[in-house]
Amino acid sequence: MGVTKELKSPGNGVDFPKKGDFVTIHYTGRLTDGSKFDSSVDRNEPFQTQIGTGRVIKGWDEGVPQMSLGEKAVLTITPDYGYGARGFPPVIPGNSTLIFEVELLGINNKRA
């Protein structure tokens, strides 16, 4: 249970986000049946958040710090690290495993 990371394209291998850092990412979220529920890429607007502080789902708080600046990866997140039994109606059913394609574009003021 938790989050697993599949590397798609390596980052710089040097800069990794730490708890409390602000990150800029592009992502596409899908359910295991392949249906897309959200995408910053489709909106052409990267997502910014503080990581490791509970502002996003636990799977992101745990998975994004495993990525280095510029990296592209797929994060597979079990329900207990996602939206749990309640889900996120109407787009994410309860107990859903989430699959996110993520690109780490920035950490604080440093860009890939």
Curated annotation (Swiss-Prot):
Enzyme Commission (EC) number: 5.2.1.8
Activity regulation, short description: Inhibited by both FK506 and rapamycin.
Gene3D superfamilies per the UniProt record, alphabetical: 3.10.50.40
Chief location category: cytoplasm
Gene Ontology MF annotations: peptidyl-prolyl cis-trans isomerase activity
Subcellular location: Cytoplasm
InterPro entries with a match to the protein in the record: FKBP-type_PPIase, PPIase_dom_sf, PPIase_FKBP_dom
PROSITE patterns: FKBP_PPIASE
The protein's role, per its UniProt record: PPIases accelerate the folding of proteins. It catalyzes the cis-trans isomerization of proline imidic peptide bonds in oligopeptides.
Gene Ontology cellular component terms for the protein in this record: cytoplasm; cytosol; nucleus
Organism: Aspergillus fumigatus (strain ATCC MYA-4609 / CBS 101355 / FGSC A1100 / Af293) (Neosartorya fumigata)
Official protein name in the record: FK506-binding protein 1A
Family: Belongs to the FKBP-type PPIase family. FKBP1 subfamily.
Top-rank lineage group of the source organism: Eukaryota
Catalytic activity: [protein]-peptidylproline (omega=180) = [protein]-peptidylproline (omega=0)
Every PPIase FKBP-type domain range: 20-108
This protein's UniProt keywords: Cytoplasm, Isomerase, Rotamase
